[in-house]
Curated annotation (Swiss-Prot):
One Pfam family here: Acetate_kinase
A molecular function GO annotation: ATP binding
Family: Belongs to the acetokinase family.
PANTHER family assigned: ACETATE KINASE, BUTYRATE KINASE 2-RELATED
Keywords of the record: ATP-binding, Cytoplasm, Kinase, Nucleotide-binding, Transferase
NCBIfam families registered for this protein in UniProt: butyr_kinase (TIGR02707), PRK03011.1-5 (NF002834)
Domain of life according to the entry: Bacteria
Name recorded for this polypeptide: Probable butyrate kinase
GO cellular component: cytoplasm
Record flagged with keyword Cytoplasm: yes
Encoding gene per record: buk
């Protein structure tokens, strides 16, 4: 079975073709700010990104013939984890999503390309809005603002299943804390195959990250909102996009920050250590959700390649549970394997409503 995988990100479009479990093509096409700035809204990039996929297939001599097309899921309504067919309800909710992110293009592009092929379904799997929270985890200090969760569900669940397989058990039999360290940082508590607690890693909860502010002092935030200094859009950027490390240090480049630290930059050292401190504190808090009975802590994402960060993080959290590190992201493989599982009848295809 041949699967086409499409993963639009904020600064890249990732494309893969799988023949069963074997990758035939994996490409990561980077986009400059200038290249994307000609599109007023992210959704306006649809044709541009779709054509990139087609051009990449043609350039690599891959016939446009697939048994399924799967895209990275968008920021639709909260849904349980799993594989979903892209239907009209999902397309409409994606087009009118409350939050903007390039991932919203994944299912739309998958659906359009699949529609041009005979008997070819379009899927998404484990989008960032996967919501399996316990009811107690939904309550915030204000009924006006119930907790929502937006996190790296696809990568976290893929890493959880990989770890379980390595341990000779099943994801559904483990209690895990998983931390994805990337442009955003998400920390989720996985209990017997469900993420019963996770932060909103996109716009305003948890530790700060290379480009996101995380939890902020609410009173000060209100004062800034009414100061007249910023528009609504400018403030949103200062929470997600131009926040975190880039707000403090002018860059999201963690290796460059570490190099500056090694050359004696004390401010860079303080800010990066503060991010590590906040991540560790959040992981420690997550352990209380499981009453301290944690089988393992899994660290993943692009920043997990950094020995500087991982060693300092381990120093703070190693007393909680065994730590396993899975650098990078397994999103393309995970999407492909989810599509294969659906085609083979091993995974149920859920209906988005």
């Amino acid at each position: 079975m041949k699967i086409l995988v499409i993963n639009p990100g904020s600064t890249s479009t990732k494309i893969a073709v799988y023949e069963n479990e074997t990758p035939l093509l994996v490409r990561n096409i980077k986009h400059t700010v200038e290249e994307l700035s000609v599109y007023p809204q992210v959704i306006d990039q649809f044709e541009f990104r779709k054509n990139l996929v087609l051009q990449e297939l043609e350039a690599n001599g891959i016939p446009f013939a697939f048994d399924a097309v799967i895209g990275r899921g968008g920021l639709v309504k909260p849904i349980p984890g799993g594989v979903y067919a892209v239907n009209e309800a999902m397309k409409q909710d994606t087009l009118h999503a409350m939050r903007t992110h390039a991932c919203n293009l994944g299912g739309l592009i998958a659906a359009e390309l699949a529609a041009s092929l005979p008997d070819c379904p379009a899927f998404i799997a484990d989008p960032g809005v996967v919501d399996e929270l316990e009811d107690v985890a939904r309550i915030s200090g204000s009924p006006l603002m119930p907790k929502i969760t937006i996190w790296h569900a696809l990568n976290q669940k893929a890493i959880a299943r990989r770890f379980a397989k390595e341990q000779g058990t099943k994801y559904e039999e483990l209690d895990l804390i998983i931390c994805h360290l990337g442009g955003g940082i998400s920390i989720a508590v996985h209990q017997h195959g469900k993420a019963i607690d996770a932060n909103n890693a996109l716009d305003g909860e948890g530790p700060f990250s290379p480009e996101r502010a995380g939890t902020l002092p609410a009173g000060q935030l209100i004062d800034i909102c009414y100061s007249g200094q910023f528009t609504k859009d400018e403030l949103k950027k200062r929470i997600s996009g131009r926040a975190g490390l880039t707000a403090h240090l002018g860059t999201t480049d963690v290796p460059a920050i570490i190099k500056a630290i090694e050359e004696g930059d004390k401010k860079a050292e303080l800010i990066l250590d503060a991010m590590i401190y906040n991540v560790a504190k959040a992981i420690g808090g997550a352990a209380t959700v499981l009453c301290g009975k944690v089988d393992a802590i899994l660290l993943t994402g692009g920043i997990a390649y950094s020995d500087y960060i991982i060693s300092r993080l381990k120093k703070r959290i190693s007393f909680l549970a065994p730590i396993h590190v899975y650098p990078g992201e397994g999103e393309m493989e995970s999407l492909a394997f989810n599509a294969l599982g659906a085609l083979r009848g091993e995974l149920p295809v859920q209906i988005y409503k």
